[in-house]
Amino acid sequence: MRVLGGRTGTLLACLALVLPVLEANFLSRQHASQVLIRRRRANTLLEETKKGNLERECIEELCNKEEAREIFENNPETEYFYPKYLGCLGSFRAGLFTAARLSTNAYPDLRSCVNAISDQCNPLPCNEDGFMTCKDGQATFTCICKSGWQGEKCESDINECKDPVNINGGCSQICENTPGSYHCSCKNGFVMLSNKKDCKDVDECVLKPSICGTAVCKNIPGDFECECAEGYKYNPVSKSCDDVDECAENLCAQLCVNYPGGYSCYCDGKKGFKLAQDQKSCEAVPVCLPLDLDKNYELLYLAEQFVGVVLYLKFRLPETTRFSAEFDFRTYDSEGVILYAESSDHSAWFLIALREGKIEIQFKNEKTTKMTTGGKVINDGLWHMVSVEELEQSISVKIAKEAVMNINKPGSLFKPTNGFLETKVYFAGVPRKMENALIRPINPRLDGCIRGWNLMNQGTSGVKEIIQEKQNKHCLVNVEKGSYYPGTGVAQFSINYKNESNPEAWQINVSLNIRPSAGTGVMLALVSDNTVPFALSLVDSATEKLQDILVSVESMVIGRIEAISLCSDQQTFLEIRVNRNNLELSTQLRKDSFHSEDFQRQFAILDEAMKGTVVTYLGGLPDVPFSATPVNAFYQGCMEVNINGVQVDLDEAISKHNDIRAHSCPSVWQKTKHT
C-alpha cells in the first residue's frame, strides 16, 4: 500500500473526536509531560504544505481519518487503514483502546503494528501451498500462484491430467493429479522411460524364460501369454499344455474321435452318410448318376444268393414223364449253374450250366456218366431261348430252336419209383453235398436271368406266384456288362501281393474301370486286423458335380487327384501302382507320383502291413472303426477291377454281399424313356 504525505490536523482535535468517553481519562503528570515533549510538532508556517507521511502523521503523532485520507489520497486505502490503525492505538498507547489489543498482539510495538496495516500481504492472505508471491495493492492484494495452482488466493489445484491442450498431461498411459502438480505412471507390465512420461513394455518372456514352462511364451503389450498348439490349453498349475477333449463339447453330429491336439468327426458311411463341408455335420451321400433300377417279377434273378440255390422245386409226375426244361436266358457271366435236377434218392442227376459262355451238360444215371459242352457263346447280354429235352435214347439241346447238341444216353435219366417220377429241380446252384461230385467241377454262381420257363412240361409251376412279392428275386430289366456295387456291402478276396522272387518286396498294381452313381465311397481297401493300411476312395469334390480320388494309409491321405468328372455315362479308367518307395496315381488325363520321402511314416506302415497278411475288400470296408480311414461309405456304381494283371471275378470272392452283381450293371436312367 502506498504511503502518501498530506496536511495534518491537530493531534488534540483528532483525539477529541475518536476517543470514547469511557476511555478519556486524564494522564498522569509524568505521562502528560512525556507526551507533550515527545509528540511536539514543529511550529512552522510550512507544516501544512508538507506531503503527508505515515510515520510522522500517524506514528509519531496521532492522526484522524481525514488526515489518513490525506496520507493515502484515496478512499479504498483509507477505509482499509483507519479501523486497523485505531486497533493498533488501542493496543500500544498506554491505557487506551484496550478492547482491540487481542487482535494486534502479533506486533511488538505501535510502529510495527501501523506499518503492517498498509501491507495487504501481511498477514498472508494467499494459500501457503499454492502461492509463489503476494503482491501488495491499493486496499487489495494479488496472489501470484505456483505452477499447478489457480484461484484468487491460489487455493485451487489445477488438474493437469484434464488439460484439453496437453491431453492426459502428456502421459502415455496413466496421469495422476497431485496438489499443485501431477505425475505419470505406467500400467502393470510397463516401465517408465527417462522422460517420465512415456512407458515401455516389459518383455516378461526375456526376463523369465521359464515363466510358461513347456508352453510357448508370447509377449503382449503390458503382459504375456502362454500359448499352446491348436487343440491344447495351458495349465497354469503344471505350466504345461493339456489336450483339449473337443468331443466332450459334442461338436460332431455322429461320431467324434479325440486325439492329442485335435479331433475328427466321422459319419456312418455304411448307412449312407458322409461328412459335410463343415467337417462336423453329416449329410446323405447324394446320387450323382441315376441308374435304371426297374425290375420285373417275371424275370428270375439267378444270383440272388452268393451261397446256395435261388429256388427249389419238387415234381412227382407219372412214371412215363421224361425230363425237359425250356426257358429264355440272359447273362454276361461266362460260368455258372443254370439248373440242376436229381432223383429223390440222389442216385441220378442232371446239370445244365454255362462254361466259357457255352452250354454245358453233365449227367449221371444208373448206366453212364457224361459231360458235353457246345453250341455258340450266349453270354452276350441278349435273351436266348434254351431248351433241353430228354428223348428216348438221347438228350437234345437247342438254342433258339436250333439243335446245338445231341447227347446219346443209355436208359432214362431218372428211374421211376412206385409208378411215379420224383424229381427235384434247383435253380442256379447244386446241393452242397454234390459240389464235389460233378464230373467236372464248376463255380455254381451265375449272374443271369431266366424268364418264360417251362419245367417238366408243367409250365411255370407256380414259380411266378412264389417270387412275385420277393424283390430280391426279380431281375433288372436293363443291364450292361460290368460289376455293380449297390452301396450296401463288400466283396472279400485273399490276394497275394508279394513278389515271389523277393519275399521282402511287394507291389500293388490296380487298374479300374469305374462309373460311379454316388460321388463318395471306398473302391478298394487292404485290411489288417482293425486297421486299413491302404485304401482307394472317391469323395465329392469341393467343386460342385466333380469328385476327388484319394489314396490313404490308415487315416492319412497320401495321394489325391482333385476335381475330375466321374459321374457320367462313360466309364473312367483309373490306375494305381504302389511299392515300398513310390505311389503312382493316374487317369486318362493326369498322372501324379508320391514318394516315400514325403510320407515316411505312412509308407513304413504300409510296408510293414504288406509283409504280413492283408485282406482285400472291394466296394467298401468291413467292420472296422470309423476312424480307420478318411472315407468309410460303401462304393455305389459299376466297377471292374484288375489286380496285378488278373481280372477280378466277383464269383471267386471268399464272400460277397448278395446285392453285389458280379457281371451285370444297371443302365443309366434315361429321362426320355420314362416320360
Swiss-Prot record:
Residue list for modification 4-carboxyglutamate: 47-48, 55, 57, 60-61, 66-67, 70, 73, 77
Record's keyword annotation contains Kinase: no
PROSITE patterns: ASX_HYDROXYL, EGF_1, EGF_2, EGF_3, EGF_CA, GLA_1, GLA_2, LAM_G_DOMAIN
Annotated EGF-like domain residues: 117-155, 157-200, 201-242, 243-283
Residues covered by the Laminin G-like domain: 299-475, 484-665
GO cellular component: extracellular space
Glycan attachment residues as annotated in the record: 499, 509
Biological processes annotated in GO: blood coagulation; fibrinolysis
CDD domains referenced in this protein's UniProt entry, alphabetically: EGF_CA (cd00054), LamG (cd00110)
Range of residues in the leader sequence: 1-24
Site (Cleavage): 93-94, 111-112
This protein's UniProt keywords: Blood coagulation, Calcium, Cleavage on pair of basic residues, Disulfide bond, EGF-like domain, Fibrinolysis, Gamma-carboxyglutamic acid, Glycoprotein, Hemostasis, Hydroxylation, Repeat, Secreted, Signal, Zymogen
Location in or out of the cell: Secreted
PTM field: The iron and 2-oxoglutarate dependent 3-hydroxylation of aspartate and asparagine is (R) stereospecific within EGF domains.
Organ and tissue specificity: Plasma.
Residues modified as (3R)-3-hydroxyaspartate: 136
Modified residues ((3R)-3-hydroxyasparagine): 177, 219, 258
Designated name of the protein: Vitamin K-dependent protein S
Classification of source organism: Eukaryota, Metazoa, Chordata, Craniata, Vertebrata
Gene name as annotated: PROS1
